[in-house]
Amino acid sequence: MYAVIRAGSKQFRVSPGDVIKVDSAPHSESGKLEIADVLAVSNGQGKFGSPENATVTAEILGDGRGDKILVFHYKRKKQYKKLQGHRQGFTALKITEINVDGEKFTIDDMPKKEAAPAKARRSTKKAAAAE
């Protein structure tokens, strides 16, 4: 089960249990955020084109700032150099449930991912000689 939502000016493909970082969003102290701007929902058969009565509920994990991006300006032959740094603020959200037409899908409803089998290690000549 996944949904495509619009948060801020970006679109995200989310499932229950996912953690996403959206541009700093104004939020209340309740710790919950309901996103009603759902673009598509899929649970095997897809519902595309702004499904009605679809919302995504998220838990607010906190605010933060991203990595620093350096912006360097210079003018050749004029000895002019300017270095600026910028850190974009974000709000971390954990998707708790997807509601579609009265049905709620949570992390407990998601199929469990099976662990991939361990790959067999290839022996090298040095390792074979040491044994």
Swiss-Prot record:
Instruction: Name the GO cellular-component terms.
Output: cytoplasm; ribonucleoprotein complex; ribosome
Keywords, A to Z, come to: Ribonucleoprotein, Ribosomal protein, RNA-binding, rRNA-binding
Task: Provide the residue span(s) of the region labelled Disordered.
Answer: 106-131
One GO molecular function term of this record is: rRNA binding
Query: What domain of life is recorded for the organism?
Result: Bacteria
Give a GO biological-process term: translation
Regions of biased composition (Basic and acidic residues) lie at: 106-116
One Pfam family from the record: Ribosomal_L21p
Function, as annotated, reads: This protein binds to 23S rRNA in the presence of protein L20.
The record describes its quaternary structure and partners as: Part of the 50S ribosomal subunit. Contacts protein L20.
Similarity comment: family membership: Belongs to the bacterial ribosomal protein bL21 family.
Please report the name of this protein according to its UniProt entry.
Large ribosomal subunit protein bL21
